[in-house]
């Protein structure tokens, strides 16, 4: 670099303005720290480079938790959605997950506007090429233009930009997503800091012209009439609007044949790809290879926004050559006359092994260097946002001299996500799912505010408005449950006739209205005719009351399990600097414990290679040290 010059210092520099970077920067700025968020292109702020939706199974929980902590994703998507659906409604409330289609352009514009209008926050177009560290402390960052920004903390939220390599068959080129510039020099800077990098891969399907498809042969997938907001600040508000349709169709046997005939032209199967792809979002080539007995696969057709004719074709991501893609897409039902607007591609990128991080997402050895999002080996906008807000909070806590802000597995899905990454690591892009969470019934998406907002308010991130709304919600639920306990329903002929009409058994003796609601065939709403004193509650509160009542026993059991879990989580291991000094541990346990540096006995117990007998050895060692 020919000429370097110094710029004004910042408390925090966030590198990357995707979903992790936006939440991180907003958190540090709102906590009073002078923050810069830098992006290779301001046109890619809060970009949705793959699917045009927010939420989904497990992911919706993350968005609600980010919102409960005072984050922005939920508020922005509530303003910019074009379709809303609650998934898994036939199952229990633990796995209900909100999923909405976003208007990509409006989402970008809205989030960019929030960043531009946030106090203490500067949005800067620049490529960060170097991080300077002195005595294991962050000193500055340098941009490609030669500007040196002194800073006390850096949060890396680089997405898929680090040495990004786009692949379409034999055609490969260096690039970030959507034709954006990739970043090579920052990868070299990280390696110079002793941080090992590895390669992961993801992909995206083609975008096709809306008017070139035959929707009459597809199944319409409309949005829900009753729109539930993502942000708790919008609970009780009507945010409904005219919604766009999505569509379901299928690949055919001809699709399968074309892919099989051209597999050797896919970089995945030609040995060009070094990165590991996502297990739970496979390319169409992967599906054909992994499920050879299936002659058809689901394809979802989703609009990208109100101001564009581009349609996102979920389920058909591919790295095949462009001409093969076009031939293959035409064999999908309803795609006979399809016109491509953007071709499908795979992208390979650098990321770290997240076991080098603390649960605050700070590097184990370099103070105030934080990582969030896909650079940690995760996939998905929601996973990125969850990590971003935690990294931002903890960067602020460090610089303000306050205690770390850690969510554990019993606190939040965000806690599960981060614990999995930093404790177990991941060999493939990590996707959040409800099945990863041990305490699903207590960590529902509808109670994220009751779980997290008070803690976020204590550190100054959740606003007074958000906190007071949560307190009112809690008070209303508690009072209604107590009221229902006090109302007796007696076995009169009129009562039993009403019960028969509702498909419920007659009463022999009097019971409380609360116990009546516990019957599987009855709901809170259906019991209104037995409750002359009932006042009208908003739907979101009625559902909360019903969930508390129907699952009371299960929730109590899970709370007991959480109590036991907390005992191990609260046994801190910071007294042990080198596990070689602990006699009786297996060699593998010593290596893993020294590498990962678990913060608690609970975290140590979840490390692969650390056995129950190793945990007992640690327990005995800790007890003897206390004496």
Curated annotation (Swiss-Prot):
The lineage of its organism: Bacteria, Bacillati, Bacillota, Tissierellia, Tissierellales. InterPro entries: FAD/NAD-bd_sf (IPR036188), GIDA_C_N (IPR049312), MnmG (IPR004416), MnmG-rel (IPR002218), MnmG-rel_CS (IPR020595), MnmG_C (IPR026904), MnmG_C_subdom (IPR047001), MnmG_C_subdom_sf (IPR044920). The gene is mnmG. One of its GO terms (cellular component) is cytosol. Its main location: cytoplasm. The keyword Flavoprotein applies. The keyword Transcription regulation does not apply. Homodimer. Heterotetramer of two MnmE and two MnmG subunits. Keywords: Cytoplasm, FAD, Flavoprotein, NAD, tRNA processing. PANTHER family: GLUCOSE INHIBITED DIVISION PROTEIN A, PROTEIN MTO1 HOMOLOG, MITOCHONDRIAL. This is tRNA uridine 5-carboxymethylaminomethyl modification enzyme MnmG. NAD(+) binds at residues 277-291.
């Amino acid at each position: 670099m020919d000429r370097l010059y110094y710029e004004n210092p910042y408390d925090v520099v966030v590198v990357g303005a995707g979903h992790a970077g936006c939440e991180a920067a907003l958190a540090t700025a709102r906590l009073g720290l002078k923050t810069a968020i830098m992006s290779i292109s301001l046109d890619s702020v809060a970009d949705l480079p793959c699917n045009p939706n927010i939420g989904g199974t497990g992911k919706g929980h993350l968005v609600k938790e980010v919102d409960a902590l005072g984050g922005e994703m939920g508020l922005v998507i509530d303003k910019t959605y074009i379709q809303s659906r609650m998934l898994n409604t036939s199952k229990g409330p633990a796995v209900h997950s909100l999923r909405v289609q976003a208007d990509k352009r409006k989402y970008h514009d809205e989030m960019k506007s929030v960043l531009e209008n946030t106090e203490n926050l500067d949005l800067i177009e620049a490529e960060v090429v170097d991080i300077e560290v002195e005595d294991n402390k962050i000193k500055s960052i340098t941009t490609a233009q030669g500007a040196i920004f002194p800073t006390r903390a850096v949060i890396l939220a680089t997405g898929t930009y680090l040495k990004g390599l786009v692949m379409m068959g034999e055609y490969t080129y260096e690039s970030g997503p959507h034709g954006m510039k990739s970043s090579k020099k920052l990868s070299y800077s990280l390696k110079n800091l002793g941080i090992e990098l590895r390669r992961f891969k993801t992909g995206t399907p083609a975008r096709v012209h809306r008017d070139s498809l035959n929707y009459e042969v597809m199944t319409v997938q409309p949005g829900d009439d009753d729109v539930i907001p993502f942000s708790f600040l919008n609970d009780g508000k009507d945010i409904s609007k005219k919604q766009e349709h999505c569509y379901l169709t299928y690949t055919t046997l001809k699709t399968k044949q074309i892919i099989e005939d051209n597999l050797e032209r896919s970089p995945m199967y030609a040995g060009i790809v070094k990165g590991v792809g996502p297990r739970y979002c496979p390319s169409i080539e992967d599906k054909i290879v992994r499920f050879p007995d299936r002659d058809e696969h689901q394809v979802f057709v989703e609009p990208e926004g109100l101001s564009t004719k581009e349609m996102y074709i979920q389920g058909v991501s591919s790295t095949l050559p462009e001409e093969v893609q076009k031939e293959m897409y035409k064999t999908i039902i309803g795609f006979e006359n399809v016109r491509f607007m953007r071709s499908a591609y795979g992208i390979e990128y650098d990321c770290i092994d997240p076991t080098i991080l603390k649960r605050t997402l700070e590097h184990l050895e370099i103070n105030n260097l934080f990582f969030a999002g896909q650079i940690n080996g995760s996939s998905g906008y929601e996973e990125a946002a969850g990590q971003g807000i935690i990294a931002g909070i903890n960067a602020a806590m460090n610089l303000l001299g306050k205690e770390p802000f850690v969510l554990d597995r019993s606190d939040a899905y965000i806690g599960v996500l981060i614990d999995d990454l930093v404790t177990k690591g991941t060999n493939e892009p990590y996707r959040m799912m409800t099945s990863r969470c041990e305490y699903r019934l207590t960590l529902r998406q509808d109670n994220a505010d009751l779980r997290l907002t008070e803690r976020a308010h204590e550190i100054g991130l959740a606003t007074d408005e958000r906190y007071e709304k949560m307190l009112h919600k809690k008070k209303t639920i508690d009072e209604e449950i107590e009221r229902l306990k006090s109302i007796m329903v007696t076995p009169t002929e009129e009562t039993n006739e009403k019960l028969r009409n509702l498909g419920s058994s007659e009463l022999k003796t009097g019971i409380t209205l609360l116990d009546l609601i516990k019957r599987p065939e009855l709901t809170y709403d259906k019991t209104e005719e037995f409750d002359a004193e009932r006042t009208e509650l908003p739907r979101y509160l009625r559902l909360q009351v019903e969930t508390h009542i129907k699952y009371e026993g299960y929730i109590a059991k899970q709370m007991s399990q959480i109590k036991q879990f907390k005992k191990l989580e609260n046994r801190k291991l910071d007294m042990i600097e080198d596990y070689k000094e602990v006699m009786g541990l297996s060699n593998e346990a010593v290596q893993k414990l020294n590498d990962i540096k678990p913060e608690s006995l609970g975290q140590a117990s979840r490390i692969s290679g650390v056995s129950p007998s190793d945990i007992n050895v640690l327990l005995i060692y800790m007890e003897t040290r206390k004496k």
